[in-house]
Amino acid sequence: MSTYTRPVMLLLSGLLLLTLAIAVLNTLVPLWLAQEHMSTWQVGVVSSSYFTGNLVGTLLTGYVIKRIGFNRSYYLASFIFAAGCAGLGLMIGFWSWLAWRFVAGVGCAMIWVVVESALMCSGTSRNRGRLLAAYMMVYYVGTFLGQLLVSKVSTELMSVLPWVTGLTLAGILPLLFTRVLNQQAENHDATSITSMLKLRQARLGVNGCIISGIVLGSLYGLMPLYLNHKGVSNASIGFWMAVLVSAGILGQWPIGRLADKFGRLLVLRVQVFVVILGSIAMLSQAAMAPALFILGAAGFTLYPVAMAWACEKVEHHQLVAMNQALLLSYTVGSLLGPSFTAMLMQNFSDNLLFIMIASVSFIYLLMLLRNAGHTPKPVAHV
């Protein structure tokens, strides 16, 4: 059976349009708030409201999928995000935008859980690495194109909201021409997220998603600040961030294929070791281009490989709950990691960014090496 089936291709096509809309809004909302002369703490609280919505959406989506299936859950998630987009134009104010960004956060997280769970359930233990690699490539390409759109079109609020809302609704169209089957058995009891987080044989995958959240959250949020403090111009910062993200895009497919062929444990060990090497190279401040490239290629591909590792340790009917647990773990890591790292950078040195990334990666590498002889046979084959 082909890895990239018609439902998978149509699902990823819809996701590309949704990711474009998400990237544009996430970039422009803080700027719009600043234009309304809102204080820094208000901008921060509105951003936190969005991420709080992410957490709530992650927790709710498993129940929604079980009740109405993948297709209708995807439509619902898209409509919720579209409402969060359009609502920004109804009333411009702190409390109004606090509420609408929460709604958008819920819809965004629901989209991620639905798409990731559908891909997990569509694949087998032999091709999930490639499916998740394709998913991450679409996500990063959509994010890149979204940034490109921001630089080429008018960024006025009432100019952007109509076409961003339209993009979100257009993301529904591909799924109208196919049906993603919900293959969870009806005779199984509902699986809780907590039980998945506690599952011993999947712990390396859960921990890997937390580490991935810390690494990517820190790189996304703090790398521009690090470069700025080193005297790099804004234009050059954009170039170096493009190098980082491009490396992540280029690394997805080959690493996903290697994980399917040689096993995810081996690939995870190599990835984490390369992240440590890239961090050390950045600290040495020699040859920043190759250092950033290998850091991006290894760091940005941790999440899909760790996710595939965890999902092959559970039964098929547990995949949606496991995916929720993994996305929740990633979100927690991406929230806590940058906050703690930023405090260290402010009080000590900007170099703590890469020391922190190398340290958490080293701890995870020890976990991976410790489990050398404990690799139970995958159970989610079908």
UniProtKB/Swiss-Prot annotation:
The keyword Iron-sulfur does not apply. GO terms for molecular function: transmembrane transporter activity. It is a multi-pass membrane protein. The chain crosses the membrane at residues 14-34, 45-65, 79-99, 102-122, 131-151, 157-177, 204-224, 235-255, 270-290, 291-311, 325-345, 348-368. SUPFAM superfamilies: MFS general substrate transporter (SSF103473). PROSITE patterns: MFS. The keyword Heme does not apply. It is found in: Cell inner membrane. Belongs to the major facilitator superfamily. YcaD (TC 2.A.1.26) family. This is Uncharacterized MFS-type transporter YcaD. The lineage of its organism: Bacteria, Pseudomonadati, Pseudomonadota, Gammaproteobacteria, Enterobacterales.
